[in-house]
């Protein structure tokens, strides 16, 4: 879609919704609307129902973690209007305690997307019909896509053949730290390490 058409759409939405839109950005051929949490459901409903918009498809909800910010999470809604052949992105900011209103009453397909955002980031959605983990195990500790979550995790899950069941154990890094010599004679160096001499063939 052209920048001009996106600019017109942005102006129309800001004119109709007023203070419900904190910011509208055009970047890389896409329109992003930043809205306060309290206005989210009204904005999503308008974008779905308005004749000029008709964003009837919710294609994704994702989280983004910025731990240095006071409101560390962005909740990002990707919408599609097949009739208008347009895409739009809606963002709200939240912290660990902010209740983001569930989009399920507006887009029924939001249910599993919100469960995933809760599972991976710990973002809380108020009014969600079944807010529980969807990808990690039920006893999982923490939220694995947060920037402060350790790469190794907290527990190791494996099948124990003696007990004939899955067991949870604290993570044990079984390999000591190793300092690798990256100066390999096989990578085009102009020197030969002792013991790596090639036999002469002529």
From Swiss-Prot:
Q: Name one GO cellular component term.
A: plasma membrane
Superkingdom as given in the UniProt entry: Bacteria
Looking at its record, which EC class is this enzyme? translocase
Stored InterPro entries? NADH_DH_suC (IPR010218), NADH_quin_OxRdtase_su_C/D-like (IPR037232), NADH_UbQ_OxRdtase_30kDa_su (IPR001268), NADH_UbQ_OxRdtase_CS (IPR020396)
What EC numbers are recorded for this enzyme?
A: 7.1.1.-
Q: Which HAMAP family does the record match to this protein?
A: NDH1_NuoC
Q: Which family does it belong to?
A: Belongs to the complex I 30 kDa subunit family.
Q: What is this protein called?
A: NADH-quinone oxidoreductase subunit C
Species of provenance: Brucella canis (strain ATCC 23365 / NCTC 10854 / RM-666)
Q: What is the lineage of its organism?
A: Bacteria, Pseudomonadati, Pseudomonadota, Alphaproteobacteria, Hyphomicrobiales
Question: What gene name does this entry carry?
Answer: nuoC
């Amino acid at each position: 879609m052209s920048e001009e058409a996106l600019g017109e759409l942005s102006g129309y939405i800001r004119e109709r919704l007023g203070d419900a839109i904190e910011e509208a950005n055009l970047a890389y051929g896409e329109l992003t609307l930043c809205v306060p949490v309290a206005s989210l459901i009204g904005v999503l409903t308008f974008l779905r129902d308005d004749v000029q918009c008709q964003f009837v498809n919710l294609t994704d909800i994702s989280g983004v973690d910025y731990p240095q910010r006071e409101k560390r999470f962005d909740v990002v809604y990707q919408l599609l209007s097949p009739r208008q052949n347009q895409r739009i992105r809606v963002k709200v900011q939240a912290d660990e305690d902010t209740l983001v209103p569930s989009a399920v009453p507006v887009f029924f397909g939001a249910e599993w997307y919100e469960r995933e955002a809760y599972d991976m980031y710990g973002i809380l959605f108020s009014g969600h019909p079944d807010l529980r983990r969807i990808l990690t195990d039920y006893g999982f500790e923490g939220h694995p896509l947060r920037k402060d979550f350790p790469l190794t995790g907290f527990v190791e899950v494996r099948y124990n053949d003696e007990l004939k069941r899955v067991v949870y154990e604290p993570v044990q890094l079984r390999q000591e730290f190793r300092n690798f010599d990256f100066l390999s004679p096989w990578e085009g160096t102009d020197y030969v390490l002792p013991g790596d001499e090639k036999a002469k063939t002529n």
